[in-house]
């Protein structure tokens, strides 16, 4: 009996383990069909299959629809063959590797809601997405590749937010890359969670602090302590570094916003730095650290520059 499995999405932090699992599982189950996907294999799928003869195919780019198409293909064999399926690189029975064209970006409102059975997610952080893509072009970031910025329908978003609120989920972490890049979208979501606050659920957002306008700031000021928390990417305060990585951040504005939100006393702020960026030596990084630390965020997170496929 043949089985179709989709292994864990491949990221820089797990690729080595996924590759080893693929090798080992093929030894004990040689008839199994293995597909992998994710950012670490999407951009060089042919090389991945050359390196991993145990893997039958790579899903490149957005995988929701591609994975469904693969399941239909292996289940009934009546769907179009792999040669007509977009968004994949696959190995034919002859061993030849074929790379198909990329799939068009998805309508985000058609992505299924996966949290209907909350028992499966007990004691886990809920990750939720209302937009995909990013309007910026930071050269170290995978999100800058996807220029097609899309938003989930707001009526659908409200319905799903209410589901989380009704179930008293402890935390919902939005994975939107720059949540406040569209003012009306951000305000609608923030107003909704404020008006329907259950006194328990916390919502985490990644925002560009220098894009927060007066209306947004005044709304944030009125929120229950702990209703939202904000993650703000600074990465560096070195102007040469900021220019080199094509980042548009204005640190003076970021600092002003962070201090003002601090004065509200109701929002946990989480600021990020990256070590290893261009033009950033030990002394320069120390200054970036001091600049951010002086803002007194509740959390300062330090990441290290990683070479990401596709970036």
Regions found by a protein language model. Give the residues of each.
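Short, small-residue-biased leader/transition segments that mark boundaries at the very start
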Residues: 1-5
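Glycine-rich beta-alpha loop elements in corrinoid/cobalamin-binding modules
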Residues: 6-102
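Short, solvent-exposed loop/turn segments at secondary-structure junctions
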Residues: 11-15, 40-42, 63-66, 104-107, ...
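A short helix->loop->beta-strand "cap" motif at the edges of active sites that frequently abuts
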Residues: 28-33, 55, 199-201, 226, ...
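Catalytic cores of alpha/beta
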Residues: 45-51, 216-220, 278-294
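Radical SAM [4Fe-4S] cluster-binding motif and immediate context
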Residues: 109-263, 275
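Flexible glycine/acidic-rich beta-alpha junction loops that bind and position SAM and/or redox cofactors
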Residues: 183-184, 234, 240-245, 275-283, ...
């Amino acid at each position: 009996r043949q089985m179709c499995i989709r292994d864990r999405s491949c990221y820089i932090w797990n690729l080595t383990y996924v590759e080893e699992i693929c090798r080992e599982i093929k030894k004990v189950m040689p008839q199994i069909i293995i597909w992998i996907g994710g950012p670490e294999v999407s951009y060089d799928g042919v090389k991945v299959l050359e390196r991993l003869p145990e893997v039958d195919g790579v899903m490149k780019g957005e995988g929701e629809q591609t994975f469904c198409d693969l399941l239909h293909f292996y289940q009934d064999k009546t769907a179009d063959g792999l040669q007509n399926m977009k968004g994949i690189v696959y190995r034919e029975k002859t061993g030849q590797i074929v790379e198909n064209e990329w799939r068009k970006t998805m309508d985000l409102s058609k992505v299924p809601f996966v949290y209907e059975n909350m028992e499966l997610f007990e004691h886990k952080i809920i990750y939720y997405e209302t937009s995909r893509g990013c309007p910026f072009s930071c050269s170290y970031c995978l999100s800058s590749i996807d220029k097609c910025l899309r938003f989930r329908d707001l009526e659908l978003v409200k319905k799903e937010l209410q589901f989380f609120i009704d179930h008293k989920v402890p935390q919902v972490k939005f994975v939107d890359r720059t949540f406040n890049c569209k003012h009306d979208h951000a305000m609608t979501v923030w107003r909704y969670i404020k008006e329907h606050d259950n006194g328990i659920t916390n919502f985490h957002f990644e925002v560009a602090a220098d894009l927060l306008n007066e209306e947004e700031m005044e709304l944030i000021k009125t929120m229950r302590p702990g209703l939202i928390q904000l993650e703000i990417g600074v990465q560096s305060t070195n102007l040469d570094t900021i220019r080199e990585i094509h980042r548009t951040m204005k640190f003076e504005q970021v600092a002003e916003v962070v201090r003002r939100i601090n004065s509200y006393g109701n929002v946990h702020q989480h600021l990020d730095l990256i070590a290893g960026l261009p033009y950033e030596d030990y002394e320069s990084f120390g200054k970036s650290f001091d600049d951010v630390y002086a803002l007194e965020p509740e959390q300062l997170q330090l990441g290290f520059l990683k070479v990401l496929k596709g970036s």
